[in-house]
A protein has these predicted regions:
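Hydrophobic alpha-helical membrane-interfacial segments at the cytosolic entry of transmembrane helices
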Residues: 1-8, 12, 102-104, 168-177
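Periplasmic/ER-lumenal interhelical loops and adjacent helix-loop junctions
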Residues: 1-82, 86
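Hydrophobic alpha-helical membrane-insertion segments
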Residues: 16-35, 96-110, 172-177
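Membrane-interface helix-loop-helix junctions at transmembrane boundaries of multi-pass membrane enzymes
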Residues: 43-57, 82-112, 161-172
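Membrane-helix boundary/interfacial segments in multi-pass membrane proteins
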Residues: 60-73, 104-144, 157
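Alpha-helical transmembrane segments of polytopic integral membrane proteins
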Residues: 80, 84, 104, 114, ...
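Membrane-interface junctions at the ends of membrane-embedded or membrane-associated helices
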Residues: 91-92, 142-176
Length: 177
């Protein structure tokens, strides 16, 4: 399980993002939020029965695949809608580069949940075997998604009529997000 010149595969993939946890890009706290104890959440404890307080003190707010987290990776529904709309209305190669970087970062963040892909990168991509927290690669998606969303906004500002001409694509973007 040890890589030739790097870290142990289990160690590399310990902080893997869950496949279903990817929904946190769209919906915050899909997997419960941070790893902090449930009693630290005023909203959760608002209607809690005090007789179960010892149980609440042992429960974390997070139930995803990682050993723990300070909170989800969240981009937002509106930004994701603009990202998807940007895939339809932004012209040029930058759109495809941003989409590829986004998809690649999401797939790599899955780590142990997508081992054939992860093993390929560990074995053949220089320095990847020394990468400790694979979920942190989502910072790329957190950059590329808003960037394409901003390019979509620029297109809309430059050509306001595009929304009426491409109304079905606008509806599709809303529907997908």
């Amino acid at each position: 399980n040890q890589t030739a010149n790097g870290l142990d595969r289990d160690y590399i993939t310990q902080w893997s993002y869950g496949i279903d946890e990817t929904w946190t890009l769209l919906v915050p706290n899909t997997k419960g939020g941070a790893s902090a104890p449930l009693v630290n959440s005023d909203k959760a404890m608002e209607h809690a029965d005090n007789q179960f307080m010892p149980v609440y003190q042992q429960l974390g707010q997070y139930w995803g695949d990682q050993p723990g987290t300070m909170g989800p990776v969240y981009v937002g529904a509106f930004v994701l809608m603009l990202f998807v709309l940007g895939l339809f209305i932004v012209k040029g190669g930058i759109k495809w580069a941003l989409l590829a970087a986004t998809v690649l970062s999401i797939l790599l963040s899955w780590g142990k949940n997508f081992m054939p892909f992860t093993n390929f990168f560990i074995d053949y991509v220089p320095m990847y075997a020394k990468f400790r927290t694979v979920a942190s690669i989502l910072v790329i998606a957190e950059f590329t998604i808003p960037l394409l969303a901003m390019l979509a906004l620029k297109k809309i500002v430059d050509d306001p009529g595009i929304l009426t001409r491409k109304i079905k694509l606008v509806y599709l973007s809303f529907g997908l997000t």
